[in-house]
Amino acid sequence: MNLSQRVKKLKPYVPGEQPQDRKYLKLNTNENPYPPSPQVKKFLQNLDADRLRLYPDHLAIKLREKIGERYGLNKDQVFVSNGSDEALSFCFYALFDSLNGKLLFPEVTYSFYPVYCDYYGIEYEKIPVTRELAIPVEEFVKRKGSCGLVFANPNAPTGTYLTLKDILYLLENYPPEKPVLVDEAYIDFGGESAVPLLRDHKNLLLVRTFSKSMCLAGVRLGFVMAGKELIDALVTVKDSFNSYPVSTLTQKIGEIALSDESYYRSINNKIIAVRESFSSDLGKLGWTVLPSKANFVFTGKQGVPGKEIYMKLKERGILVRHFDAEKVRDFVRITIGTPEDMERLLGQMKTLF
C-alpha cells in the first residue's frame, strides 16, 4: 500500500496506560478522582435526546460567553475545541512557521509538543531545563530569532511552576509579534493564571482544559483565551478542518460545569491538601519530591530506577507514569487521588522501597 512519506516519519504521542486486564488504582493519567458537578449528572439524567438530531452551534456562542464571564473576557477572546489537545494542534498549525525561526519549548515538557511539530513540519529547539528541572526563562528570552514559545505552566510532567512575575518578564523581553503559548491545563491546583496579562500582551495565548480540575476528561473539551486576532486565526483553521468539532452535549455540559464553581473549588482544594500531605510523607521516607502546583507529584528515590518503581507498583495493582527521557528517568509521576488512594499507595511504597 502506498502511504504518504509524512505518515512514515511520524512518531505518535503515547498516552498513559488504560489497561483492561485487571482492576488497577489508576494514578497515571492525571484524572480527577472526584465526580463531575451534581448539576452535570442531573442534566444527563434528564437529557432531551431529541436535541441530538440537530447539528451543534458551530460557534459555541453560549459556552464561549460563559467562559468569558468566568475569566473577565468577551466571547471573541475565547476559542473552544474537542479537548485541549485539539486546541494545541490548531495553535501549532495557525501560529508557528519555521520561516520565522524555530519554535522553542522546554526539553522536559508535554510530549505532544514535538509530535505536533513533526506533524506540521515545524522546526523546533528544546531548551534545557535547570538542575531542579525548572523552566529557564532567561534562555527563552535570549533566543529572539525563534518563531514562538510554548510551555506548560505548571509544567508537565514535573509540576514545576512559573510565577506571574516570571511570565510577565518573559513577555516584556520577547518580540511582541511572536506568539507565546502557555498551556494552563493544571493551573487550578494552586497556580495563578496569566489571564490578567492578556490585556496588554496581544501575542499571549492561554490553553485550558475541562479534563483536570473540572473532572470531565471523558467529555473532551478545551479552550483558548487570547486576543481576537489570534482567536480568528484558530477559527479559520477549525473551519478548514471540521466546522462542528464540539458536540451539543459537550457544549451544554461545559456551560453547566462553569456554573458550579464552588463545587469544583471545594474538590480541588481537597486535592491540593492531599498533594501537600503526600509530598511531606514521601519526603520523610527519603524520597525526592519536586514542588508541585499540579494534581500530581514528580518523585524519585536515590538508588532506585524510575522504571523499577513503576514496574513494582504495577505488579501491586497501582499505575503511575514513567518517562524514559534522560533527565527524568529516575522519577515517576503520580496523580493525586483521594486520601484513601494515597494511603494505599504510600503503604506499598514503604513496603517495596
Question: Where on the chain are the PLM-derived regions?
Answer:
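N-terminal "arm"/small-domain region of PLP-dependent enzymes with the aminotransferase-like
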Residues: 1-54, 145
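Conserved PLP-anchoring active-site segment centered on the Schiff-base-forming lysine
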Residues: 94-116
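PLP-dependent enzyme catalytic core of the Aspartate aminotransferase-like
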Residues: 165, 312-316, 321, 325-353
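Conserved PLP-binding catalytic core of the aspartate aminotransferase-like
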Residues: 272, 284-316
